[in-house]
Amino acid sequence: MTDFDEQWKKVMGEEYVRKNKGIFDFTQKRVEEFKKLTGLEDNGLDGKICLDAGCGPGRWTYAIQQLGAKKVDSFDISSEAIKLCKKINPNAHLDNILALKPNPVYDFVLSWGVLHHNKNVRDVFTKMSSQVKEGGMLHIMVYNKKYDHEYDSYRGDTSIEKHKEWEKLSFEEKIKICENKVKTNGGDIHGWFDAFNPEVSLSFTPEEVKEWFKEEGFDKIKLMVKSHFNSIPTSQVNMNGIKS
């Protein structure tokens, strides 16, 4: 079982979903949140071919579908996540972002909270860029380095070493840490588990990420609003650009 299989199988279990009701509901509220995060409008993906790279259980795949996408290819490294995503998207499949070959056919490519779980993030960004057609949009979210101190060394340059401690904990102990974070910092159990559980959780400045976009030939680069999954302001770099 990978880090992410544990996350999607156990933390998406009935007990924890009940405690965090609504986080992964496929509803109009989810679509409205996605619109705010990306700057897309109603029918903003009408007739478009889209890719959700690292789709998890499919919350953003659903939003992309509702914004009019003609087709959404969704993939994830976790078989447990794909089981969930397939309920809404028959095109969901198991794959690894590191295995992507250049394939610039997509009008919209999303990589939400995925790149920073790879040791060679810049190389993975290039792989994501290679999927976007001319005039298409790439939207990514990675962790913001400025707020690493809120994550008890589980995020940023210390994450790999800190993960060795995490692996020694029981699942119940891990959940307890997340519950305490919810009490002191806000957010939800899944959001904190998602931050603490992966072996690699690197972080970057908005300036670094913007430079990646420029180097890969994107313009109209925009830093968007933060996510609402945890309460720490701007704890994520949420950015998109248009392939020129």
PLM features: what roles do these ranges have?
Residues M1-G44, K48-G54, M137-K176:
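Conserved class I S-adenosyl-L-methionine
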Residues V200-E216:
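Short alpha-helix
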